[in-house]
Every structure is written in C-alpha cells, then in structure tokens.
Amino acid sequence: MTLSIIVAHDKQRVIGYQNQLPWHLPNDLKHIKQLTTGNTLVMARKTFNSIGKPLPNRRNVVLTNQASFHHEGVDVINSLDEIKELSGHVFIFGGQTLYEAMIDQVDDMYITVIDGKFQGDTFFPPYTFENWEVESSVEGQLDEKNTIPHTFLHLVRRKGK
C-alpha cells in the first residue's frame, strides 16, 4: 500500500473555515480528481459531511466513531488501525485531526499551496522540508476561474525521517 496525504492549505496552513474550503480553485479540484481517481480516499466524517456525497470513481472511506453513521457508496471504518488494512494507493483527505494523526506515517504528500492568507478554524499540521524532499513543484495556471496563485507540490518523505 502507498499512503499519501492530499491537501490544499494557505500560507498559514489554513485548510478550512466553518467546515468549508475558504477559497474556490477549480484547478485544485481537477488536480485532486487526476490523482485520486481509481484509488481510495480516507476522510473523517465531518470532511465527508462538508462534501455531502462520495466522490465518483474512487473508493470513499469515512473514519468515524459514530456507530450509526451510514451513507450509500461509502465504506466506514472506526479506527486509524483500519487504514493500514486498506490496499492500493490510499489518500488521506482530511480533516485536521486525521492529518495530525497520519502525517508521520505517510509516504508522501500532495500539497496545493494557496498563495494567500485566509480566515480559518482548521489547519494542516506543521511540517519541515528537513523531513520531506520536493519531488515536484508546479505553478498553477491562472485564468478567470482560477484567480488565486497556487503551487502544486509533491513531497516525498526523506529516508529515515
């Protein structure tokens, strides 16, 4: 199994505000689709609720401690240990608590860095480039729908870190 994080954060590592993304960036949604189609997304229940439905053409797994949680098209797990039982390429998809729990266990991270500062109440955990090697860094294209400068980073964990 390959275990990756996929996330977008601003310069202050904001990832959300009031259970929503603080920005609208279609390029990032397209990037997520390209990377995760055919693979597995693991997200916490509140993240799933903010999306409202399973993302198509991938396995959607929701981590929750609510025994009554059920949604068509979603597999439910109740512990972090169950993530290790998944196969294929697994993407950790948020939110904050799940990122905090998994950042030291993932092989790599796909990060969209939003070049701005947004109001937020949820954050991506701190990370340093001491532990991560930049595999690629691509500037996002700006247009009438994508007006916020952004960079797509692929970071790979350094050996022994």
Curated annotation (Swiss-Prot):
InterPro entries in UniProt? DHFR (IPR012259), DHFR-like_dom_sf (IPR024072), DHFR_CS (IPR017925), DHFR_dom (IPR001796)
Q: Which Pfam families match?
A: DHFR_1
**Reported function:** Key enzyme in folate metabolism. Catalyzes an essential reaction for de novo glycine and purine synthesis, and for DNA precursor synthesis.
Q: What further fact does the record state?
A: There are two DhfR isozymes in S.aureus, this one is plasmid-encoded and is resistant to trimethoprim.
Q: Could you say which residues bind NADP(+) here?
A: 7-8, 15-20, 44-47, 63-66, 93-98
Its recorded name reads Dihydrofolate reductase type 1 from Tn4003
**Tell me, which GO biological process terms does this entry list?**
dihydrofolate metabolic process; folic acid metabolic process; one-carbon metabolic process; response to antibiotic; response to methotrexate; tetrahydrofolate biosynthetic process
The UniProt annotation places substrate binding at I6, V7, A8, D28, R58, T112
Q: Which gene codes for it?
A: dfrA
Q: What is the effect of changing Y99F?
A: Increases trimethoprim sensitivity
Q: Which GO terms describe its molecular function?
A: dihydrofolate reductase activity; NADP binding
SUPFAM superfamilies linked: Dihydrofolate reductase-like
Q: Which family does it belong to?
A: Belongs to the dihydrofolate reductase family.
Coiled-coil stretches: none
> What reactions does this protein catalyze?
(6S)-5,6,7,8-tetrahydrofolate + NADP(+) = 7,8-dihydrofolate + NADPH + H(+)
Report the pathway entry: Cofactor biosynthesis; tetrahydrofolate biosynthesis; 5,6,7,8-tetrahydrofolate from 7,8-dihydrofolate: step 1/1
Q: Broadest EC class?
A: oxidoreductase
Question: Where does the record place the DHFR domain?
Answer: 2-157
The record's GO CC annotations read:
cytosol
What EC number(s) is this enzyme filed under? Answer: 1.5.1.3
Does Oxidoreductase appear among the keywords? yes
Keywords (A to Z) from UniProt = Antibiotic resistance, Methotrexate resistance, NADP, One-carbon metabolism, Oxidoreductase, Plasmid, Trimethoprim resistance
CDD domains membership? DHFR (cd00209)
